[in-house]
From Swiss-Prot:
UniProt keyword terms in alphabetical order: ATP-binding, Chaperone, Cytoplasm, Magnesium, Metal-binding, Nucleotide-binding
Organism: Aspergillus fumigatus (strain ATCC MYA-4609 / CBS 101355 / FGSC A1100 / Af293) (Neosartorya fumigata)
Binding site for Mg(2+): D273, N275
Keyword Acyltransferase part of the UniProt annotation: no
Biased composition range(s): Acidic residues: 82-96, 329-347
Function summary: ATP-dependent protein-folding chaperone for the eIF2 complex. Binds to the gamma subunit of the eIF2 complex which allows the subunit to assemble with the alpha and beta subunits.
Region Disordered, annotated ranges: 1-23, 72-96, 323-352
Name of this protein: Translation initiation factor eIF2 assembly protein
């Protein structure tokens, strides 16, 4: 039997102590549906920015799912008999207008853009096409025309996930007593158009709720903002009060993640989104393992009950995983003294950890770092897609010629060696 180097053995033991899979509770179909915008927004309408949810027809959903990017013409052709000769072009462009199958939705989008002052931001039931903003002239989600919206939706992997994989990793609800094999529920898809607001990204925060307890929170933008540290206590208090009064007892599930925006003067909290308690939701400044192993008041009480009378309970975890103390050790002590004091007294209120990007964090100055770069395509591919099926076929032909030429050159080079 070979001997292990002590360091290797320690590493192996550490790896063994780590769970092989994140210890999430089962994610049910209903939980995913509860986090769909059309499900939660009516309940919290007064807490959200102004928006409209447009029900989507099967033909429009099929358009989003279809390969290639074919956009409707910017101007609508007349359909009267008197105008046929004037605008006739032998029907060459008749098939190039995909909106003929969903004219009502197209008209609703136009009217909503006009109603909201000419600028909106789009999303589907769960996701906004943030990974496709590089396709936009403004490099954000701002849309002024229906075609701006269609271009973002059809260029986004996030939207594709909403359409094709919303229930990945999910299980049927435990109260489903049907003996028939569980089938995924039908999804009524919606296009959500929100009035465009130039949000200050430094004031957006993601909050994690477990067992109806606000467990922790962090900033969404991963750049350092020095002014946030002096506001940490105020913002934490605002978010905690908002959660206690508006969300704690009203959202159907005990575990979820929600996003808020708190603009100056930091008096009002706006609910921006609600996300599943699942690894598909980005934990941002935390890791999911770290969050799942955090203690909340319920876990602390259970630990107190199980502990012998002569022992004491420490807010730490066995093994090589981060402890509560270790997680907090990097936080600015001056800003987080109240969290430490809250843990010392039995009657002290539980305070969620509020994590901010510090000045010396490696990711603190990523202003020039492009987000979602893995989702981008070469400009030539995008241009070919915009030209329709013919443009893409021409591009593929040229690409194959280039590959064949490169292969031939490599072969000739090998033969001459």
């Amino acid at each position: 039997m070979p001997l292990l180097d002590p360091n290797t053995q320690t590493l192996a033991e550490s790896s063994a102590a780590q769970p092989q899979r994140l210890p999430f509770p089962p994610v049910t179909y209903s939980h995913i549906l509860h986090c769909s915008y059309h499900q939660w927004q009516p309940r919290y309408r007064t807490l959200t920015p102004k928006s409209r949810a447009i029900p989507l027809t099967p033909s429009f959903v099929s358009y989003l799912r279809a390969n290639g990017i074919v956009l409707p013409p910017e101007t609508t052709r007349p359909h009267g008999d008197d105008d046929i000769d004037t605008f006739s072009d032998d029907g060459a462009d008749e098939e190039s207008d995909p909106s003929v199958e969903w004219q009502e939705i197209h008209s609703q989008i136009k009217s909503t853009i006009s109603e909201f002052g000419g600028k909106v931001t789009p999303k589907l039931n769960w996701s906004a096409p943030k990974d496709a903003v590089w396709m936009s002239a403004t490099n954000d989600l701002q849309c002024r025309t229906p075609n701006d919206i269609y271009l973002l939706l059809k260029s986004s992997d996030f939207i594709t996930h909403d359409l094709e994989h919303p229930f990945d990793g999910c299980v049927p609800d435990p109260d489903d007593s049907s003996e028939a094999p569980a089938t995924q529920p039908d999804i009524p898809y919606y296009l959500v158009l929100r009035k465009y607001v130039n949000f200050n990204p430094s004031l957006e925060f993601r909050c994690f709720v477990r067992n109806r307890v606000l467990l922790c929170m962090c900033q969404r933008d991963q750049n350092h903002f020095d002014f946030l540290f002096s506001l940490r206590d105020t913002l934490r208090s605002r978010i905690q009060a908002f959660f206690d009064e508006k969300l704690k007892d009203t959202f159907p599930d005990p575990n979820f993640v929600f996003d808020v925006y708190i603009p100056e003067p930091h008096q009002r909290v706006w609910l921006i989104d609600i996300n599943p308690w699942a690894d598909r939701t980005d934990p941002l400044l935390f890791s999911w393992l770290e969050i799942l192993q955090m203690k909340d008041p319920i876990g602390i009480k259970e630990e107190d009950t199980d502990a012998p009378e002569e022992s004491f309970v420490r807010l730490s975890l066995n093994g090589a995983t981060p402890t509560v103390v270790e997680v907090n050790r990097d936080e600015d002590s001056e800003s987080e003294k109240d969290v430490g004091s809250a843990d010392d007294g039995d009657d002290s209120p539980f305070l969620p950890e509020f994590r901010l990007v510090k000045r010396d964090d490696p990711e603190a100055y990523s202003f020039s770092t492009p987000q979602y770069s893995a989702h981008k395509l070469p400009k030539e591919v995008v241009d070919a897609s915009l030209a329709g099926s013919g443009g893409m076929s021409e591009f593929l032909g040229k690409w194959q010629d280039i590959l064949a030429k490169q292969t031939q050159e490599d072969t000739d080079s090998d033969d001459g060696r």
